[in-house]
UniProtKB/Swiss-Prot annotation:
Primary site of residence: secreted
Full protein name: Lysophospholipase
Entry function: Catalyzes the release of fatty acids from lysophospholipids. At acidic pH the enzyme hydrolyzes all phospholipid substrates without metal ion. On the other hand, at alkaline pH the enzyme shows substrate specificity for phosphatidylcholine and lysophosphatidylcholine and requires Ca(2+), Fe(3+), or Al(3+) for the activity.
pH dependence: Optimum pH is 2.0 and 7.5.
Post-translational modification: Highly glycosylated.
Highest taxon in the source lineage: Eukaryota
GO-annotated molecular function: lysophospholipase activity; phospholipase A2 activity
Similarity section: Belongs to the lysophospholipase family.
Location of this chain's protein in the cell: Secreted
GO cellular component: cytosol; endoplasmic reticulum; extracellular region; plasma membrane
């Protein structure tokens, strides 16, 4: 309860200022529409995905200057009272080359994932009151990468693009009007009883999207969705950052100085009209420098600043002229969560006043056409690229339009793929799972099984992922109710293409609040937001370290494990007990669980949105989750 009590005691006014360069921060039109800008006459905007970009490599050198001392401090605190043998910390943290590289992945799951994930992240942030004493404070400061998908990307994007604000700062201001994550009212009816406020909001959104359309760019419902979301994430900016661009972050001091992790947003490639999204779909990432994919169906990145430029194999069709402003921050965040476009399309199930319904229905129908859950990136920045191997489909490069969808539509609801690239040399990934896999909307490890299976398919070239059990085993062994380590012994992973990072799986589970809310619950009271965040904090800390006082020490062992193995160093003997307790030991129980709930509580009041997903009883069982998604969407009813 300490976390909520600290929230009740703190009513400090903490402004979240955006230190942005006026030229670089916005679209050249100062609005939502992209515009033409001058660029180098010899510029080529694409590169082969055979390494991290030069910009990322340069940034990593700066970031490591912050992560190494932060990680050393974290590990020393973790070992205090846990072991007297701290020699390995000094050995590994002596240089940047031997220091473990940490990444965090935030799953999708709507506002549930955003809020529960916020609690999880806050437990790792030394800026959170009590995180150093009752949580994993400093782990966020020790991390190099922070990936988000759908609702998890709302969390990552909010923090990153509000000048790396903290969850604590958001909480401190949560009772203020127009604060970050002020979602007391639905996104469709943001004004609540003030219907004129809602009309004004949607009128502004309509005008913004129309500006993009008049500028000659295709629009879809994702433009509407992204614009609507932005008001909740960037309330201090004009019209929710109507001209705020994704690439802006590269020019912001807190990022340039390496004071925050490298943010990554994830989406998946798909064509409109198709109903197949499986593990062979192309996984796209957006970072402050680039957008593109490591997958061999693309294997290319492009400068995200100039997305929207007509190109052929990366060369602008008009010499010396590029387009800027297409990479609107809300549009990128909307692309990663485009599944929620269906929410806007269900207006006939709402209790909106007729005149607001008519306004929205006409606007959204015109905007959506046949692209219900698709984000349109046109012109295609990868048109006629030549980096795709001949034995892979060339379809992405052959179309003049790039179609992207919600990053979780391929079943990989935790954005792990960008973090598994050997070029990034990550040693440990903290996988925060706020999925709604079971009938009661708790996670059951399904996302991990999909990522594991993907490495053996067409798109698995170049990646490796630790062995994981089937989803029934996750539930039967309770692996989805507590933190679990996967890939603890590199000697058992030699059959894989490479030695993958150790994965620390941290699922949403009930500690003090029923956090298994519906993915499509689109409004949360202030009290609900506080409780969701508090429960998330408790879920990743073994309830504020009360269930295991050595938990931080065990997390420290997990962080050190890969580097210790590769350099043949010795961990403290106390780590053996940690691995015995938290590592999955290969036991499988694939029988159908008696109950599919993962809550530690005997009851739940959540609305299910998991559909009729049939849990696989095999480790290797890739399959599409589109039927699940459609089934869930068909029963969506919006209430205000």
């Amino acid at each position: 309860m300490w976390f909520l009590n600290s929230v009740n005691l703190l009513f400090l006014v903490c402004s979240v200022a955006l230190h942005l360069d006026a030229v670089n921060a916005w679209s050249p039109t100062n609005g939502y529409a992209p515009g033409v800008v001058d660029c180098d006459e010899n510029i080529n905007l694409v590169r082969k995905a055979d390494a991290v970009s030069d910009d990322e490599a340069d940034w990593l050198k700066v970031r490591h200057e912050s992560t190494v001392p932060a990680l050393k401090d974290f590990l020393q605190r973790g070992f205090k009272g846990f072991t007297n043998d701290t020699s390995i910390i000094d050995k590994l943290l002596a240089t940047q080359d031997t220091a473990p590289k940490v990444a965090i992945a935030c799953s999708g799951g709507g506002y549930r994932a955003m809020l529960s994930g916020a609690g999880m992240i806050s437990a790792m942030d030394n800026r959170t009151d009590g995180a150093n004493d009752h949580g994993l404070g400093g782990l966020l400061q020790s991390s190099t990468y922070l990936a988000g998908l759908s609702g998890g990307n709302w969390l990552v994007g909010t923090l990153a693009y509000n000048n790396w604000t903290s969850v604590q700062a958001i909480i401190n201001n949560m009772t203020d009007d127009n604060s970050i994550w002020d979602i007391s009212n639905s996104i469709v009816n943001p004004g609540g009883i003030n219907i004129f406020s809602s009309i004004s909001r949607w009128d502004d959104i309509s005008d913004a999207v129309e500006e993009k359309k008049k500028a000659g760019f295709n629009t879809s419902i994702t433009d509407v969705w992204g614009r609507a979301l932005s008001y909740n994430f960037f309330p201090s900016l004009d019209e929710g950052g109507v001209g705020y661009t994704w690439n802006t972050l590269r020019d912001v001091d807190v990022f340039k100085n390496g004071e925050m992790p490298f943010p990554i947003s994830v989406a998946v490639g798909r064509y409109p009209g198709t109903q197949v999204v499986n593990l062979n779909a192309t996984v796209f990432e957006f970072n402050p420098f680039e957008m593109g994919s490591w997958d061999y169906t693309l294997h290319t990145f492009t400068d995200v600043r100039y997305a929207g430029t007509n190109v052929t194999n990366g060369t602008p069709n008009v010499t010396g002229k590029c387009v800027a402003g297409f990479d609107n921050t809300g549009f990128v965040m909307g692309t990663s969560s485009s599944l929620f476009n269906q929410f806007l399309l269900q207006l006939n199930t709402t209790d909106l006043p007729s005149f607001l319904y008519n306004l929205l229905h006409g606007f959204l129908t015109d905007a959506s056409d046949d692209y219900d859950d698709i984000s349109i990136w046109a012109p295609n920045p990868f048109y006629e690229i030549t980096n795709i191997p001949s034995n892979y489909s060339q379809s992405i490069s052959e179309d003049d339009t790039l179609y992207l969808v919600d990053g979780g539509e391929d079943g990989q609801n935790i954005p792990l793929t960008p973090l598994l690239q050997t070029e990034r040399e990550i040693d440990v990934i903290f996988a925060l799972d706020n999925s709604a896999d079971t009938d009661q909307s708790w996670p059951d490890g399904f996302s991990l099984t999909q990522t594991y299976a993907r490495q053996f398919g067409l798109q698995g070239k170049g990646i490796a992922f630790p062995y994981v059990p089937d989803v029934n085993t996750f539930t039967n062994l309770g692996l989805n109710t507590r933190p679990t380590f996967f890939g603890c012994d590199a000697r058992n992973l030699t059959d894989l293409e490479s030695i993958p990072p150790l994965v620390v799986y941290m699922p949403n589970t009930r500690e003090s609040f029923n956090s298994n809310t519906s993915t499509f619950k689109m409004s949360y009271s202030t009290s609900e937001r506080f409780k969701m965040i508090q429960n998330g904090f408790e879920a990743v800390t073994m309830k504020n370290l009360t269930k295991d006082e050595n938990f931080m020490g065990c997390i420290s062992c997990a962080i050190l494990r890969r580097k210790q193995e590769s350099l043949n160093y010795t961990l403290p003997s106390e780590c053996d007990a940690c691995f015995e307790k938290y590592c999955w030991n290969g036991t499988v129980d694939a029988t159908t669980p008696i109950s599919s709930t993962t809550s530690s509580s005997a009851s739940s009041t959540s609305t299910s949105d998991s559909g009729n997903k049939e849990n696989s009883a095999r480790i290797l069982a890739p399959r599409s989750t589109l039927s699940l998604l459609i089934g869930g969407l068909a029963s969506v009813f919006i209430s205000f």
